[in-house]
Curated annotation (Swiss-Prot):
Component of the spliceosomal U1 snRNP, which is essential for recognition of the pre-mRNA 5' splice-site and the subsequent assembly of the spliceosome. U1-C is directly involved in initial 5' splice-site recognition for both constitutive and regulated alternative splicing. The interaction with the 5' splice-site seems to precede base-pairing between the pre-mRNA and the U1 snRNA. Stimulates commitment or early (E) complex formation by stabilizing the base pairing of the 5' end of the U1 snRNA and the 5' splice-site region. The keyword Nucleus applies. This is U1 small nuclear ribonucleoprotein C. The lineage of its organism: Eukaryota, Fungi, Dikarya, Ascomycota, Pezizomycotina. PANTHER family: U1 SMALL NUCLEAR RIBONUCLEOPROTEIN C. Keywords: Metal-binding, Nucleus, Ribonucleoprotein, RNA-binding, Zinc, Zinc-finger. Gene3D superfamilies: Classic Zinc Finger (3.30.160.60). Pfam families: zf-U1. It is found in: Nucleus. InterPro entries: Matrin/U1-C_Znf_C2H2, Matrin/U1-like-C_Znf_C2H2, U1-CZ_Znf_C2H2, U1_snRNP-C, Znf_C2H2_sf. GO terms for molecular function: mRNA binding; pre-mRNA 5'-splice site binding; U1 snRNA binding; zinc ion binding. It comes from Fusarium vanettenii (strain ATCC MYA-4622 / CBS 123669 / FGSC 9596 / NRRL 45880 / 77-13-4). Belongs to the U1 small nuclear ribonucleoprotein C family.
Amino acid sequence: MPKFFCDYCDVYLTHDSMSVRKAHNSGRNHLRNVVDYYQQIGHEKAQSVIDSITSSYAAEGQAHANPMLPQNQPGQGFPPPPFGFPGGIPPPFPGMPGAPPGQFPQGMPPPPGGGRGMPPMPPFPPGPNGMPVPPNGLPFPPPGGFPFPPPGAPGAPGAPGASGGAPPPFPGLPGMPPPGQGFPPGGPPGFAPPGAGAPGHEKR
């Protein structure tokens, strides 16, 4: 059977198996040898790594100082702003509360498009009577400063028939009672209530 050589400890293990390797690798001598090995490499190689990093920074700095490179030509600053917006900053959506010019309200991401040469996205369509669209899918406030209707009332948010609310149930589903009526005593047809056995069998 082949033997396994540990580079850190400079020893051959009795044989090459997972159990022998695992036992050797968890031993304190092996762990101490691994730490010593990497500390020795760290001291020897640290200066060479530092020298290579500083030389790469020095070479990069000299490359940027070259006046013949395109990025160092006069008049080459930032790319031109995308068309449609002066200065490249898209305006906030019309009617957005708390949006100072050139900025968006906190928690609102900027609109997609309008950058990297893409045309700007059109603004959201206004709500009823020219009002801005409420944020986060909230319902429109009632006109004239009236209070919201109580929950469950017609026209209340989430009430059946209200826009954005739950749709009314579909009529005429097989096995369902007419709207407004419950199931007859005993439950729906073909359904036995809990505790009742199959028809014709009695509980003992």
